[in-house]
């Protein structure tokens, strides 16, 4: 709908509202993947994670922080409307950076995020007492869940790390051009460069039949999962 925003003032207003709402949600909890309208709680309040009444579900996925940036960027590029990049946006991008860096696991092998659910579906909860399989801190960002809401096997989810790289660079452009925040923009660019370098080093598999291909998930220790998922972002 973004490409039609300049032709429909009400559509443009709605898109701006969605963007602002997404930034607000990030600031409520950057680890959550689904939110309530207000603070009414929901069916997953019994999950063993840091649930809040504003949250519907708290499955940590990298792409949950990337899509709001991508939408806001293309809205701005199409309409020229920079009003969405307010203080809420600046707080949101600060939370994005903080969360991505926490999930690089450099300072803490486990990170602050943990998730368990009483369920019959193995992929609806995390192994290892809610921490997931271990990862080696190599510069990649850990994602507990895939865009499908299924738990990752190895937490360095490659397509979502690529998505983080492009999203951080979009954020840097906004911060430089609109907000005049070069230091914050530089932080985004530096993290994007670090993740991209790590992807080239750790996400490539030398397949006996197909040669060099990207793995779907890796852990930094040398384990690689060769598959793709129907959801986006995917390797395809």
Language model region names:
Residues 88, 117-119, 145, 149, ...:
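Solvent-exposed, flexible loop/coil residues
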Residues 1, 11-12, 51-63, 147-161, ...:
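Solvent-exposed loop and edge beta-strand segments that line ligand/cofactor-binding
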Residues 29, 33, 101-118, 156, ...:
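Catalytic cores of carbohydrate-active enzymes
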Residues 18, 64-71, 160-163, 167-171, ...:
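Amphipathic, well-ordered alpha-helical segments in soluble domains
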Residues 39-48, 134-146:
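Active-site-adjacent bridging/hinge elements
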Residues 1-124:
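Aromatic-rich carbohydrate-recognition surfaces in CAZymes
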Residues 4-9, 75-88, 151, 155, ...:
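Inter-helical turn/loop segments and adjacent helix faces that build the functional surface
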Residues 65, 120-144:
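Flexible glycine-/small-residue-enriched beta->alpha junction loops
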